[in-house]
Amino acid sequence: MPNNYRIAKVSSLLKKEITLILQNDLENDLLRSNFISISKIEVTGDLQFCKIYISSAAEGNIRKEIIENLNLAKNYIKHILGQRIEMRRVPELTFKDDTALAKGLSVLKLLEELNNKTHNQNSQVEENNDNV
């Protein structure tokens, strides 16, 4: 049975170190020109695999390119992790797109549109009442 404390500790360490690697060690214009952050890390119970969820303000194809670039660089990132952290075996890394931020922004935009529409309808009703 996996030790949840150990998994949480390893996840936290990996998140910290991968964040530093993304900020300082990758020479990729696409990654440097777009704000990206690690939103979540999932490490398997045997510490063999790690999914890294990336959130970004970028949209559409740029988001896909960011994830593709990170997955192309995953062996390099794993190599640097191996030099920086003391683990018997560094987990296999997989980068995934975390669409929660984009979905949240989409919901906020819809709510704002609904609020504006309701406000416009209320204004029209008030104008009609004033004219009567």
Swiss-Prot record:
It is found in: Cytoplasm. This is Ribosome-binding factor A. InterPro entries: KH_dom-like_a/b, RbfA, RbfA_dom_sf, Ribosome-bd_factorA_CS. Keywords: Cytoplasm, Ribosome biogenesis. One of several proteins that assist in the late maturation steps of the functional core of the 30S ribosomal subunit. Associates with free 30S ribosomal subunits (but not with 30S subunits that are part of 70S ribosomes or polysomes). Required for efficient processing of 16S rRNA. May interact with the 5'-terminal helix region of 16S rRNA. GO terms for molecular function: ribosomal small subunit binding. HAMAP family: RbfA. The lineage of its organism: Bacteria, Bacillati, Cyanobacteriota, Cyanophyceae, Synechococcales. Its main location: cytoplasm. Monomer. Binds 30S ribosomal subunits, but not 50S ribosomal subunits or 70S ribosomes. Belongs to the RbfA family. GO terms for biological process: maturation of SSU-rRNA. NCBIfam families: rbfA. It comes from the Bacteria. One of its GO terms (cellular component) is cytosol.
